[in-house]
């Protein structure tokens, strides 16, 4: 434990917080180009084929991003918008692709939670 005199001389060092989305470089979203679109399996105890894409961002970093929703139209060289947000059962996936923006289409026939999936309001 430091003495009062040591604290007067030096002071306490605030612990620097580590960012969870370093590739975004402080931006809320980043544009990028898909370099590879593929499926991968989640860790135990879950089982599925999760759709993911390798994306080269405008910041120059290549990241793995999750493609949310049912079905997608992404392929290599698609321009996408990436936001932060990890997928708990996919190790190393710390970003998500924003649906309904740039080359990514929204989810079809989506009735609830539409804004998250870029789905337009259906005409009744």
UniProtKB/Swiss-Prot annotation:
GO terms of biological process kind: translation
Region (Disordered) residue spans: 1-32
InterPro entries: NA-bd_OB-fold, Ribosomal_uS12, Ribosomal_uS12_bac
Swiss-Prot/TrEMBL keywords: Methylation, Ribonucleoprotein, Ribosomal protein, RNA-binding, rRNA-binding, tRNA-binding
Molecular function GO labels: rRNA binding; structural constituent of ribosome; tRNA binding
Biased composition, class Basic residues, residue ranges: 9-18
An example Gene Ontology CC term for this record: small ribosomal subunit
Keyword Ribosomal protein found: yes
Top-level division of the source organism's lineage: Bacteria
PROSITE patterns with a match to the protein in the record: RIBOSOMAL_S12
Keyword tRNA-binding carried by entry: yes
Chain positions found as 3-methylthioaspartic acid: 89
Function per UniProt: With S4 and S5 plays an important role in translational accuracy.
Assembly with partners or alone: Part of the 30S ribosomal subunit. Contacts proteins S8 and S17. May interact with IF1 in the 30S initiation complex.
NCBIfam families documented for this protein: rpsL_bact
UniProt cross-references to PANTHER family, sorted A to Z: 30S RIBOSOMAL PROTEIN S12 FAMILY MEMBER (PTHR11652)
Family recorded in the similarity comment: Belongs to the universal ribosomal protein uS12 family.
Protein's UniProt name: Small ribosomal subunit protein uS12
Organism of this sequence: Acidothermus cellulolyticus (strain ATCC 43068 / DSM 8971 / 11B)
């Amino acid at each position: 434990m430091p003495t009062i005199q040591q604290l007067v001389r030096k002071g306490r060092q605030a612990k620097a917080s580590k960012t969870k989305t370093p590739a975004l470089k402080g931006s809320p979203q980043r544009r990028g180009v898909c370099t590879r679109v593929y499926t991968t399996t989640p860790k135990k105890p879950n089982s599925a084929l999760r759709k993911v894409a390798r994306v080269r961002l405008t910041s120059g970093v290549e990241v793995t991003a999750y493609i949310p929703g049912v079905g997608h139209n992404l392929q290599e060289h698609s321009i996408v918008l990436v936001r932060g947000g990890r997928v708990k059962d996919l190790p190393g996936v710390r970003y998500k692709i924003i649906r309904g923006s740039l080359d990514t289409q929204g989810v079809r026939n989506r009735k609830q939670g539409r804004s998250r999936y870029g789905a337009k309001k259906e005409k009744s």
